[in-house]
């Protein structure tokens, strides 16, 4: 995972001080890209322990089209709690945009179903895109999408994915984002009969919060360990049929967890 550590180092070396919505303050760079060959291991950060259950449950929650934290809570995941209202609602966030994008005529578009079918039928299409950034809905969202658009690419029987992330909390959020979209790429590849290619992660504003600088330095003092493997239940052929029982990470070696506050 040297790609991730290189981003931490770049922010330390080149970052500029900026104010932000949360009032915490950040050190930020603009424009960065990381590339991971998914055939060489599952890209879980190893220089601190990640709670993989939260990552995987959240992705399944997105794919359900859900925007209420109730299902997350039922599955012992609390990463969205700070943004939910008293009823657990978050507004039209990722799940709504992915599975039920509202059209002006009152109809909706299931972007995930659509892109999977396009991969199967038109793998060379340059329109294999899913967007969570819906300007008409931004003000109704508890938190506008940070990872806001992704595109699939098929070549030589392999499926690759590129994510554009407008805003990236590099210490807390980015390790989750890498693993989430790597998992999604594996899942979509399996249900479309493809092997995995690359995950490309492209950033707009990539930042470390001012109260994460010491934690980032600690992480950089640790040597990365070999990447684990991802194993999916090969019997699952429907993207929406995956459950936590179908997802397994093997040989995840990692350093100890590093605690850090969430900027809300």
Swiss-Prot record:
GO molecular function, one term: thymidylate synthase activity
EC number of this enzyme: 2.1.1.45
Organism: Paramagnetospirillum magneticum (strain ATCC 700264 / AMB-1) (Magnetospirillum magneticum)
Pathway assigned to this chain's UniProt record: Pyrimidine metabolism; dTTP biosynthesis
Entries under SUPFAM superfamilies matching the protein: Thymidylate synthase/dCMP hydroxymethylase
TM annotation in the entry: none
Chain residues that bind (6R)-5,10-methylene-5,6,7,8-tetrahydrofolate: 51, 169, 263
Active-site residue list: 146
Protein purpose: Catalyzes the reductive methylation of 2'-deoxyuridine-5'-monophosphate (dUMP) to 2'-deoxythymidine-5'-monophosphate (dTMP) while utilizing 5,10-methylenetetrahydrofolate (mTHF) as the methyl donor and reductant in the reaction, yielding dihydrofolate (DHF) as a by-product. This enzymatic reaction provides an intracellular de novo source of dTMP, an essential precursor for DNA biosynthesis.
GO biological process, one term: methylation
Family: Belongs to the thymidylate synthase family. Bacterial-type ThyA subfamily.
Catalytic activity: dUMP + (6R)-5,10-methylene-5,6,7,8-tetrahydrofolate = 7,8-dihydrofolate + dTMP
Keyword annotations: Cytoplasm, Methyltransferase, Nucleotide biosynthesis, Transferase
GO cellular component, one term: cytosol
A matching Pfam family: Thymidylat_synt
Keyword Cytoplasm: yes
Top EC class of this enzyme: transferase
Location relative to the cell: Cytoplasm
Protein name listed in UniProt: Thymidylate synthase
Binding site for dUMP: 21, 126-127, 166-169, 177, 207-209
Family matches, as InterPro entries: Thymidate_synth/dCMP_Mease, Thymidate_synth/dCMP_Mease_dom, Thymidate_synth/dCMP_Mease_sf, Thymidylate_synthase, Thymidylate_synthase_AS
Lineage, uppermost ranks: Bacteria, Pseudomonadati, Pseudomonadota, Alphaproteobacteria, Rhodospirillales
Subunit record text: Homodimer.
Keyword Phosphoprotein: no
